[in-house]
Amino acid sequence: MEINATTLWRDILAVRTKAPLVHNITNYVVMNSTANALLSIGASPVMAHAEEEVIDMVTIAGSLVINIGTLSKAWVAAMHKAMKKAHELQKPIVFDPVGAGATPYRTQTILELIHETPPSIIRGNSSEIKALVEAGIKTKGVDSTESSESAIEAAKHLSQKYGAVICISGATDHILNQEEYVRVENGHPMMTKVTGLGCTATAVVAAFAAINPSMMEATAHGMAAMGIAGEIAAKNVAGPGSLQVNFLDTLYSLSEADVHSHLKICA
Amino acid sequence: MEINATTLWRDILAVRTKAPLVHNITNYVVMNSTANALLSIGASPVMAHAEEEVIDMVTIAGSLVINIGTLSKAWVAAMHKAMKKAHELQKPIVFDPVGAGATPYRTQTILELIHETPPSIIRGNSSEIKALVEAGIKTKGVDSTESSESAIEAAKHLSQKYGAVICISGATDHILNQEEYVRVENGHPMMTKVTGLGCTATAVVAAFAAINPSMMEATAHGMAAMGIAGEIAAKNVAGPGSLQVNFLDTLYSLSEADVHSHLKICA
Amino acid sequence: MEINATTLWRDILAVRTKAPLVHNITNYVVMNSTANALLSIGASPVMAHAEEEVIDMVTIAGSLVINIGTLSKAWVAAMHKAMKKAHELQKPIVFDPVGAGATPYRTQTILELIHETPPSIIRGNSSEIKALVEAGIKTKGVDSTESSESAIEAAKHLSQKYGAVICISGATDHILNQEEYVRVENGHPMMTKVTGLGCTATAVVAAFAAINPSMMEATAHGMAAMGIAGEIAAKNVAGPGSLQVNFLDTLYSLSEADVHSHLKICA
């Protein structure tokens, strides 16, 4: 594992050059903003959830995003199918357990999905990561109220159980698997006031996972690109509305100098 | 009932401090923009519509938004469930009858929903409010073509029948229950060129309803906050695109001085 | 057929004055941005997909958009119903075959829909247009990787088979029916980095089709309005985020002078 400004910039260029197709089965709230972020970073997004086509779609994709933000029965069936096929084809599956712990249905559905087909990467906030390990944890909706540090033990447990890279996002992003650990310190507090930037991070990680076989590197690179773009975009903005606009502009125009001067990573 | 710049500012601070969880069962068009507006005003949005989880979700929420903009069968069943549970737990239900009168299915579905569980607050434009009272009224899609004044009699009737606060939004917002009446004169004509700002108003009202037990005060405060933010945001914008961005920035940064200098209310 | 800056400006004014109701059965990703573009150009958008109401909705609409971007069974049934009713009432149907060729389900569903009820206009990128003619064509997701020229033969074939106007959009837009051919050269490369601007073009064409009985003129006017607005909007933007915002502002404020100085059409 090698993660630094040079490897990050190399992988940003690879995403821009290869424009990997990222297949998203994601929630209604973030479909538009996620697609725009994927286009801005240089990937090619597709959103498709019909049971009749998810297998064919994941077959031509470079990676698969599963985000359970606005669940319902038919979609869960499609998620199972797409995950199985991605696993069979050894394509990265990046899983976002939005609101885990908020309702029993949500937590149980997630556990069934990841138990049947272990994802390559799971990215959530601390409440969500903890809810997947401790039954009955109290979650307040979809926004986390706890520090990301508090979920590190739960993340280690999850990683061991599913063999996945776990990313706890927050002021600090903690990324780990069974042997390795990376901390990304980029980002800006106002990012929590733009809906779905967590979901966007998951999708951006999937773009990097489509072009780099190391899931640790892909996760760290994706989270760092998000954090750096958010940090630069937040300079001199008047609020979350302009942050969202600047964020896409910044992702699109991220330069080697931006990466080298802003990356705060501890590998 | 007391509604003035001081009470409005007090309640804006309360929303920012308490960050109430607002559970939205709303339409696809506005999910993203509504969630962003709720975050900007300081609330915590959650969108969830699965029959399997709406009861649990509304149980942890501070208020419930029901918006029938993009109806279908499964969603209506979830709306019924969520409304019943909210009523049982005495949590405010804010109802948005989008496009009432446009099709018989829409009008009938709304009437069934509010007949079974009367909402705390109903917010619509004049065509929608009238369509809920007069059968066969001619509605042109989801945008109103009539003045808000023309629906006051219908609103009084609705309020009596369901015991709800009714808000007719438009150039002037008329807010009434069986005993009280308030008029809010804030806002800007260009707001009608941004999709879903009516739906957003409903959700913002729900944020205030989660922290103030007076539904009249909550409705007036929510509509006034929307109108003031829209008015300030519309200054010097080039069109609806920048209005939408500035609107979120302004909601986020609304100050005591903004409230005192802009509020145009007649209580 | 007459298509030039004078006729384009005349039809922009007609859309602004008549504010035609455009009924969209479209995909989740673009609902918000499409509705905003329709409002900015001066039309009145409505999104409705319930089988129980699509017939009533299309009856009061000026035109119908069918966009299969995020397909599923229940929606396809509603599309069939709405298309049949629109055809019966002689209202323009504008069809967007998003991602045709990406999966067999997608291609087959499109062919079934347009075989049962031929649309008035089909707008797609070159891969999509070709996929509707040549079985087994290789499509990479929803973004086209080929020039629009390469699909002209396929477009002619489609036009003959279904009696529809075909628009192949790209750097150059090719618009044709069995007798006529128009080329629109407006637009900007960065428009491909904003999600759903193709879908938006389809909806804007539907706004023009609601006020001009010539489907060739409506398509050319719609595509030209999109291209001119995109071109003006792209001046001095920092990236796709601000392009999206400027694009709406520009559509809203498009002037006679803008149209006359920018239109690049070959009729």
Curated annotation (Swiss-Prot), chains A, B, C:
GO terms for biological process: thiamine biosynthetic process; thiamine diphosphate biosynthetic process. ATP binds at R123, S169. It catalyses: 5-(2-hydroxyethyl)-4-methylthiazole + ATP = 4-methyl-5-(2-phosphooxyethyl)-thiazole + ADP + H(+). InterPro entries: Hyethyz_kinase, Ribokinase-like. Its EC number is 2.7.1.50. Substrate binds at M47, G196. Its cofactor is Mg(2+). One of its GO terms (molecular function) is hydroxyethylthiazole kinase activity. CDD domains: THZ_kinase. Pathway: Cofactor biosynthesis; thiamine diphosphate biosynthesis; 4-methyl-5-(2-phosphoethyl)-thiazole from 5-(2-hydroxyethyl)-4-methylthiazole: step 1/1. Pfam families: HK (PF02110). Gene3D superfamilies: 3.40.1190.20. Keywords: ATP-binding, Kinase, Magnesium, Metal-binding, Nucleotide-binding, Thiamine biosynthesis, Transferase. NCBIfam families: PRK09355.1 (NF006830), thiM (TIGR00694). Belongs to the Thz kinase family. Catalyzes the phosphorylation of the hydroxyl group of 4-methyl-5-beta-hydroxyethylthiazole (THZ). This is Hydroxyethylthiazole kinase. It comes from Chloroherpeton thalassium (strain ATCC 35110 / GB-78). The gene is thiM.
